[in-house]
Amino acid sequence: MFLEPERDKPHRELSGKAQPFPVPERIPIFPLPNVVFFPKTYLPLHVFEPRYRQMVADAAAGGQCIGMALLKEGWEEQYDGNPPIFPVGSVGRLASVQNLSDGRSNILLQGIERYEVREEFFEKSYREARITLKPRDRDFSMDSPLRRYLLGVLDEYLQTDEEASPLHSLIRPDVSDEVLVNSLSTYLDCTPLEKQFLLEAEHLPQQARRLSDLIQFKLAERRGAGGWG
């Protein structure tokens, strides 16, 4: 059985256009302690553990999908097993797979949609899950004042952080709201838990407001670190 994400008009992306893609109801899960994946973004990964090499091979030969999940706190004690994960993640399509001579691989995932885990399976060397897709409610879009506010906060942040200069490319009218918010959520210097908080927002305006609050908090931290005169 396949799950097909609901899609509105195609969004213009920074690195190409995502196409509707059928997502299997049961997918392999790639849990990591420091990665939160967002729809309409791209994620490069270097795969070296034997169990995840097998996962990539199976996904490439099957449904072409992998679900990224964030490991919960305390994962170190049982990493070789199946430590708990946050139930909400994003599923990606295998956009490219580069197999290396020693069995490792470099892959590129194209974010399709958020998902929620319904049931986990541990029959293979890697974890699988039965999922339900969680598309954002299209009735909740970012209005112009919210977009202007987010871009204003972002501009202020960029003036204080030269290393964040690549984010300047997002300040364009042709970048869709979804690409803007998810790309900022990906590349902003936030902790994995902060990014998970953004991913779990019920709709795009809520994610944008959470993102604005995080940027404001980081600005306040920098002002404090720099002193007040």
Model-predicted segments: where are they?
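N-terminal low-complexity, acidic/polar interaction/targeting segments
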Residues: 2-229
